[in-house]
Amino acid sequence: MSQSGKNGLTYSDAGVDIDAGNLMVEKIKPHVRSTRRPGADGEIGGFGGLFDLKAAGFSDPVLVAANDGVGTKLKIAIDADKHDTVGIDLVAMCVNDLVVQGAEPLFFLDYFATGKLDPDQGAAIVAGIAAGCREAGCALIGGETAEMPGMYSGGDYDLAGFAVGAAERGQLLPAGDIAEGDVILGLASSGVHSNGYSLVRKIVSLSGLAWDAPAPFGEGTLADLLMTPTRIYVKPLLKAIRETGAIKALAHITGGGFPENIPRVLPKHLAAEIDLGAIKPPAVFSWLAKTGGVAANEMLRTFNCGVGMIAVVPASEAEKVAAVLAGEGETVFTLGRMVARAEGAPGTIYKGNLAI
């Protein structure tokens, strides 16, 4: 029998506070309940989350799964003690990857790991996750909170998200009929989103600015503006897909920018010709480029530069698709067109100059 009593060790002595974990669960329950949707109406706390595909209205679905994190944007959240929006980023990075395949996000699970659990901090993070789930229309059906002393220093923590969606068989994207002359629509980003933050933090360090300093590129503090949540494009895109039937492909512009993300959804014989002059980058990108001396090509392969999502549509349907998206609050513009690609040529071609 193990030693017990006042001289015996407890789990708390090792740095794990079960009571703090239980307190956090109670704090997050209302946030989790707020994400309920057809197919998911259970409570958290079981060994697994449940989802009923039939109740969600699917007849012959194909499931689509994605997982992602927030990257070193979390270091800004930690250093600035601002934790209420990183959960939105976490959801956005996953569900935007689902919708580009034509899938409706159904449910989400999170993983939150920290060296020492702060129930209030954890609840703020999960509140953000729930907000992202509501915006995407998916249910938060479970998650894991891991308190791991010795694994993380100070107040550091990490997040991972897992999302599952579905599309009816035969309705997945990209479609097989992308053709030369198709139009590329750009959907504006809300800012840096959740990629390139190691470079962002390096540039901020070179600038000498503190996180609570007024941002040189907008209203608010540097931390507030750099922590602007990643835009969630799910509901507008699903509406455009279903109402127009004209979207042939979508690409989520994340790490690697245009050259790493657009070719992933294109056939080998086509390239995306991008008109850089059509982009109106948010002021943060000009500040990053000038303060860090970052060349335009490096900006384009690191950041979204103002375009968080692209859609490939027939030229004859571009105006209709853009109108549906604009009606749902998106800023949409003609970004380029599909052109022939020679064997071995890059999948993205630029014309014009980026206004940074």
UniProtKB/Swiss-Prot annotation:
It is found in: Cytoplasm. CDD domains: PurM. GO terms for biological process: 'de novo' IMP biosynthetic process; adenine biosynthetic process. It catalyses: 2-formamido-N(1)-(5-O-phospho-beta-D-ribosyl)acetamidine + ATP = 5-amino-1-(5-phospho-beta-D-ribosyl)imidazole + ADP + phosphate + H(+). Its EC number is 6.3.3.1. Its main location: cytoplasm. Pfam families: AIRS, AIRS_C. Gene3D superfamilies: PurM-like C-terminal domain, PurM-like, N-terminal domain. It comes from the Bacteria. GO terms for molecular function: ATP binding; phosphoribosylamine-glycine ligase activity; phosphoribosylformylglycinamidine cyclo-ligase activity. Pathway: Purine metabolism; IMP biosynthesis via de novo pathway; 5-amino-1-(5-phospho-D-ribosyl)imidazole from N(2)-formyl-N(1)-(5-phospho-D-ribosyl)glycinamide: step 2/2. GO terms for cellular component: cytosol. InterPro entries: PurM-like_C_dom (IPR010918), PurM-like_C_sf (IPR036676), PurM-like_N (IPR016188), PurM-like_N_sf (IPR036921), PurM_cligase (IPR004733). Keywords: ATP-binding, Cytoplasm, Ligase, Nucleotide-binding, Purine biosynthesis. Belongs to the AIR synthase family. PANTHER family: TRIFUNCTIONAL PURINE BIOSYNTHETIC PROTEIN ADENOSINE-3, TRIFUNCTIONAL PURINE BIOSYNTHETIC PROTEIN ADENOSINE-3-RELATED. This is Phosphoribosylformylglycinamidine cyclo-ligase.
